[in-house]
Amino acid sequence: MKRRTFIQKGFLAAIPLAGIAPPRWLLRPSAQVMTVNGPITIGELGTVLPHEHILVDFIGADRVSPKRYHQDEVFDVMLPYLEDARRHGVRTFVDCTPEWIGRDAGLLKRLSDASGMHMVTNTGYYGAAGEKYLPPYAYTETAEQLAERWIAEWHDGIGDTGIKPGFIKTGVDGHPLSATQRKLIRAAALTHLQTGLTIFVHTGDGRAALEELAILTDTGAAPDAWVWTHAQSEPDRALHIQAAEAGGWVAFDGLYPQLVDRYVAFLRDLKARRLLHRALISHDAGWYEVGKPDGGRVRPYVSLFQDLIPALKKAGFTTAERRQLFETNPAEALAVRIREKHRSQNT
């Protein structure tokens, strides 16, 4: 079966989110997301946290290892935070910890089963932070060779777990990107064009975001295959608007209670320009940090519900607009479908 036929026709029929008028493409049978327990339709996603973390290990690619922590301890520490998020209405949790920083697909599956929450993991390599988290072969292999590694995880699963990634996670520092960071972005685009997985890029600044977008589109991927992660770090709102107007996803995903007013202002600006459908919101919270006693201080996943949603209501955002932000947008962003330049189905 051809890869496009598999992606577009082999998935279960989509179930529209209740009370929402979805984009036309969501009515097609290709609207599916890959979780650690297998594929589900977008109608099963519910409220989504599109950028969070369960476990991280900042030791570096040369020393990171699952032997540095006890999975049972991490499970016991983190499960109550997921249960708290579940009580607040979260149905789907996107874990953005990549390989070489502590990605543990088996742990995520255990937590998914115990919490009743859908969880999504990733493939890809993280080139930010001075490229501390890259394996040596990231410098010697071509973009095509790196993409082959990531595509293999989509086809065969991560390690011996059988668990498949639901998106691509990579990362870069500020503009200008290094040669290796540019290669990672190209590898991500090549992987997308073979798998339909969306590309989440930790991004140092707005000019780096536009550089990423140029690489992706030059490689043949459409802008809506790309998420500008940590866009809140860029103070120039014009760059947010430029990326959104191009069709990319602009993610304000470092929510703290003290930043709520800034997030409301960002969303109000997008709404005024009819670009609310390009926004993603999350906390970048958690996590169990390997090497710290008891995993260190864990930040809960609930400020969105306790702080941001009440502020959005006060600012005049309707129920439909809030569902757009926390259900429809992440469902569209995560849906597995190949988005080619000049053939984007985004509406």
Model-derived features with residue positions:
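Divalent metal-coordination and catalytic microenvironments
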Residues: 51, 93, 192, 250, ...
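Active-site gating/metal-coordination segments in enzymes
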Residues: 110-113, 118-195, 242, 249, ...
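Short acidic/histidine-rich active-site segments
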Residues: 253-254, 275-298
